[in-house]
Amino acid sequence: MAKRVAEKELTDRNWDEEDEVEEMGTFSVASEEVMKNRAVKKAKRRNVGFESDSGGAFKGFKGLVVPSGGGGFSGFGGSGGKPLEGLTNGNSTDNATPFSNVKTAAEPKAAFGSFAVNGPTTLVDKKISSPKCNNSNQPPSSGPASSTACPGNAYHKQLAGLNCSVRDWIVKHVNTNPLCDLTPIFKDYERYLATIEKQLENGGGSSSESQTDRATAGMEPPSLFGSTKLQQESPFSFHGNKAEDTSEKVEFTAEKKSDAAQGATSASFSFGKKIESSALGSLSSGSLTGFSFSAGSSSLFGKDAAQSKAASSLFSAKASESPAGGGSSECRDGEEEENDEPPKVVVTEVKEEDAFYSKKCKLFYKKDNEFKEKGVGTLHLKPTATQKTQLLVRADTNLGNILLNVLIAPNMPCTRTGKNNVLIVCVPNPPLDEKQPTLPATMLIRVKTSEDADELHKILLEKKDA
């Protein structure tokens, strides 16, 4: 809507006059008949529902949706699975939650919002839907050696520890840099998960805990897990590269804790600790391995400039020691400081060797009853072979463009005007108008002082009469 225009003009004659008082109008409510004929627009949402309903790149991503089931899994990219039922630890036949004995997974706080960081649902349906121990129907024995560890229970501990470690790592780095790319994390997560599944298939349910492990579980362990047996070290590094001696090992490690009620141990994974080859060894003898992350060279979330060999690591948290780009330049010794002053333009004046008179001037030409500037240059008076005088004005440039080049004719008007001006009428060369090159024009020559103007006027009169 355009602004209101002033109703009367304010001048020096009516500035002291009072303005007429305007009455303020009031709004009136329109009747129902008028409102029926009016089109009332209402705001509507363009995208109704969640983004995954309408498709897109994250169509299958259900991580931000609260699981509808009472318990179970909701993985990194799938929907909620079925709750685990029928899991026992060998001493009781009651149904238990999948990770009741893991403290780190008791109250899961998701890195993506409100979903539990656990394994994918396909793993639940295939592998651990309802595993049971071989001796679940036998009465429990009082001896510590009679109770056997279920392979599914050990698998659950590894899976829970892996999930919790990935969750903590993601929370830490997402809080630091929310724009980081998490795609490679899930690819490596699948590799570790496949390794755990392979161990579950190869290990079977025949592994048992010895009395030595039972005795060391309650006291302060000499190693990280409290296991007195040396396991063969077989760390898994990302992209299949072996751990380098020069690089620091950032490993998933597990701390063993005693569980009096279940008679089993719970494992929690952590980053940044160097462990021995007996990592995860107390859960099952010889079938479990440690998960190591090489802090080698190229990394998604940082890079180690001191590492020379290219062992890739996607979870390397070591900050880069060298800048990523070369945007900033360092001052070196011996460099010349830049001068803020602009470079001076050096003009080489074109000299006329045979000129007997030269003077700086500014040339104007008359057009439409006003003088317009032609340029600044040097006026030269030169003798010719026909005993006439040539008036030449060259511009003060390196090229020395010719502004005016005429002969002083006997009938050429030449007058002294103004303070320091000399007025002549001639046919300009080069012409001012290419369509009418022979049309005479009035040229005004302005010099620095009045004495210079008098001298120039005197010389022009002498040469004109000669």
Swiss-Prot record:
The compartments listed are: Nucleus, Nuclear pore complex; Nucleus membrane
According to the entry, every stretch annotated as the RanBD1 domain falls at 333-466
- Which residues does this entry mark as bearing N6-acetyllysine? 8, 82, 126, 448
Q: Positions modified as Phosphothreonine?
A: 246
Name the keywords, alphabetized.
Answer: Acetylation, Isopeptide bond, Membrane, mRNA transport, Nuclear pore complex, Nucleus, Phosphoprotein, Protein transport, Repeat, Translocation, Transport, Ubl conjugation
Major site of localization recorded for this protein: nucleus
Q: Report, from the record, the phenotype seen after gene disruption.
A: NUP50 targeted disruption results in a complex phenotype characterized by neural tube defects, exencephaly, intrauterine growth retardation, and late embryonic lethality.
Q: Kindly indicate whether the keyword Chloroplast belongs to this entry.
A: no
Signal sequence span is none
In residue numbers, the region (5 X 2 AA repeats of F-G) covers: 76-302
Q: Position(s) of the covalent cross-link Glycyl lysine isopeptide (Lys-Gly) (interchain with G-Cter in SUMO2)?
A: 351
Instruction: Give the bilayer topology.
Output: Peripheral membrane protein
GO CC term (a single one): ribonucleoprotein complex
How is this protein organized at the quaternary level?
A: Does not interact with TPR. Interacts with Importin alpha-2, Importin beta, Importin beta-2, NUP153, Ran binding protein 7, CDKN1B and itself.
Domain comment from the record reads as follows: Contains FG repeats. FG repeats are interaction sites for karyopherins (importins, exportins) and form probably an affinity gradient, guiding the transport proteins unidirectionally with their cargo through the NPC. FG repeat regions are highly flexible and lack ordered secondary structure. The overall conservation of FG repeats regarding exact sequence, spacing, and repeat unit length is limited.
Q: What does this protein do?
A: Component of the nuclear pore complex that has a direct role in nuclear protein import. Actively displaces NLSs from importin-alpha, and facilitates disassembly of the importin-alpha:beta-cargo complex and importin recycling. Interacts with regulatory proteins of cell cycle progression including CDKN1B. This interaction is required for correct intracellular transport and degradation of CDKN1B.
Matching PANTHER family:
NUCLEAR PORE COMPLEX PROTEIN NUP50 (PTHR23138:SF147), RAN BINDING PROTEIN (PTHR23138)
Q: What is this protein called?
A: Nuclear pore complex protein Nup50
To which species is this protein native? Mus musculus
